[in-house]
């Protein structure tokens, strides 16, 4: 029975321009973030450089968005909204309280800095859709909320921590991959659903877990992102073996920007190497749970073309989890237990530093 009490879940994602007119704003927000664009410059110079880069990159990025067929924008906000709707249904089925689920973005719109998104507490819960901790995603989100409300939300009862190391996430991801290869997923629920499957037994192909790359300077500051990706992949691969998978398992990093050293190997390097060996290749977006430009265009088009150019025998893009029912139920369970307060600083443990208003700072 649902009571009159209403609780709010705010589903947070990185963001993406909904229309071409929002591209430069999105890029400006992205490159203005000190946890993303963290060059050792005075603040006024860093922000000026961020605006310059956003303006310079906008035309090139616009071409990529136009190629996806979503009106020149990104489908990420809409895909996140689908997940929000599914989560709202799941929470209201499971809970005696009424849940209202909103979508907020760290970059672009709807902007999580807006007044409609309230202070984290047991009645207003924030769930960032980042499986693995990184300074550039989770710590950035926490810093935005800290700036807005004057305290870090970790330990407030209104924050759901990253979930990529949870064994249940591993088993759900493995079953999703298995159901994809055995044609059990509803095609109409996934954007640009890959119709072509590898012309080999899926259990023997080379499976590349592609994560979004980060600059190595973040790793050197204490970011344990690479470790988290590796543990996520190991957990999923172990679960996949229960479905008979015996192929190659590889980890790589995509979406590098600029000349600085980033996490390696790059997915371009990995696919080139495997394709030259004549391998059957599948790519799974380990750090993404919502399809967008990096999964649809970068993985689905650029990496596919690279595979053929380098002599690969077949290529397939595995979709992101999206509204996969088991995943939505998994998230709902996390949300319902968010009032079990965290009793330590995950920012320092996973990202190398505490925020200024951390309630667990020594």
Curated annotation (Swiss-Prot):
CDD domains attached to this UniProt entry: Ferrochelatase_C, Ferrochelatase_N
Name of the gene this protein is made from: hemH
Similarity-based family: Belongs to the ferrochelatase family.
Function summary: Catalyzes the ferrous insertion into protoporphyrin IX.
GO CC annotations on file: cytoplasm
Organism: Leptospira biflexa
Keyword annotations of the record: Cytoplasm, Heme biosynthesis, Iron, Lyase, Metal-binding, Porphyrin biosynthesis
Predominant subcellular localization, coarse grouping: cytoplasm
Name of protein: Ferrochelatase
């Amino acid at each position: 029975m649902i009571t009159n009490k209403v609780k709010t879940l705010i589903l947070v994602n990185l963001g993406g321009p909904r229309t071409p007119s929002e591209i430069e704003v999105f890029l400006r927000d992205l490159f203005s973030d000190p946890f993303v664009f963290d060059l050792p410059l005075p603040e006024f110079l860093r922000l000026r450089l961020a605006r310059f880069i956003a303006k310079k990159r906008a035309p090139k990025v616009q071409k990529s968005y136009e190629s996806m067929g979503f009106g020149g924008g990104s489908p990420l906000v809409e895909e996140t909204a689908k997940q929000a709707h599914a989560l709202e249904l799941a929470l209201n089925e499971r809970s005696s309280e009424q849940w209202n689920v909103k979508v907020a973005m760290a970059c672009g719109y709807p902007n999580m800095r807006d007044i409609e998104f309230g202070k984290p507490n047991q009645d207003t819960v924030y769930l960032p859709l980042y499986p693995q901790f990184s300074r550039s995603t989770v710590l950035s989100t926490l810093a935005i909320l800290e700036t807005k409300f004057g305290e870090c939300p970790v330990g407030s009862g209104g924050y759901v921590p990253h979930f990529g190391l949870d064994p249940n996430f591993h088993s759900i991801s493995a079953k999703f991959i298995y159901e994809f290869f055995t044609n059990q997923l509803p095609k109409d629920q996934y954007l640009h659903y890959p119709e072509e499957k590898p012309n080999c037994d899926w259990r023997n192909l080379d499976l590349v877990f592609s994560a979004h790359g980060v600059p190595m300077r973040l790793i050197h500051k204490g970011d344990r992102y690479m470790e988290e990706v590796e543990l996520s992949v190991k957990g999923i691969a172990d679960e996949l073996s229960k479905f008979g998978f015996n192929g190659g398992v590889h980890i790589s990093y995509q979406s590098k920007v600029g000349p600085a050293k980033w996490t390696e190997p790059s997915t371009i390097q990995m696919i080139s190497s495997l394709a030259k060996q004549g391998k059957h290749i599948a790519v799974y977006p380990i750090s993404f749970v919502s399809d967008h430009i990096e999964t649809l265009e970068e993985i689905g088009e650029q990496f596919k073309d690279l595979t053929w150019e380098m002599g690969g025998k077949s290529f397939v893009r595995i979709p992101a989890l999206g509204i996969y029912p088991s995943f939505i139920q998994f998230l709902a369970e996390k949300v319902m237990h968010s009032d079990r307060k965290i009793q330590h600083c995950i920012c320092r443990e996973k990202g190398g530093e505490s925020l200024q208003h951390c309630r667990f700072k020594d």
